[in-house]
UniProtKB/Swiss-Prot annotation:
Compartment(s): Cellular thylakoid membrane
Its biological purpose: One of the components of the core complex of photosystem II (PSII), possibly involved in regulating electron flow. PSII is a light-driven water:plastoquinone oxidoreductase that uses light energy to abstract electrons from H(2)O, generating O(2) and a proton gradient subsequently used for ATP formation. It consists of a core antenna complex that captures photons, and an electron transfer chain that converts photonic excitation into a charge separation.
Encoding gene, per UniProt annotation: psbJ
Protein family (similarity comment): Belongs to the PsbJ family.
Protein name: Photosystem II reaction center protein J
Listed Pfam families: PsbJ
N-formylmethionine sites (modified residues): 1
Domain of life: Bacteria
Keyword line: Formylation, Membrane, Photosynthesis, Photosystem II, Reaction center, Thylakoid, Transmembrane, Transmembrane helix
Cellular component terms (Gene Ontology): photosystem II; photosystem II reaction center; plasma membrane-derived thylakoid membrane; plasma membrane-derived thylakoid photosystem II
Length: 39
């Protein structure tokens, strides 16, 4: 699966994209929940 023991670039991009979306989603969800509970 791995080319010369290195991870393919597209795999890194997919993992990074999912991670970034997950972090941003949790951040915005936390901010929205915090604002909603404070009002």
């Amino acid at each position: 699966m791995f080319a010369e023991g290195r991870i393919p670039l597209w795999v890194v991009g997919v993992v990074a994209g999912i991670g970034a979306i997950g972090v941003l989603g949790l951040f915005f969800y936390g901010a929205y929940a915090g604002l909603g509970s404070s009002m």
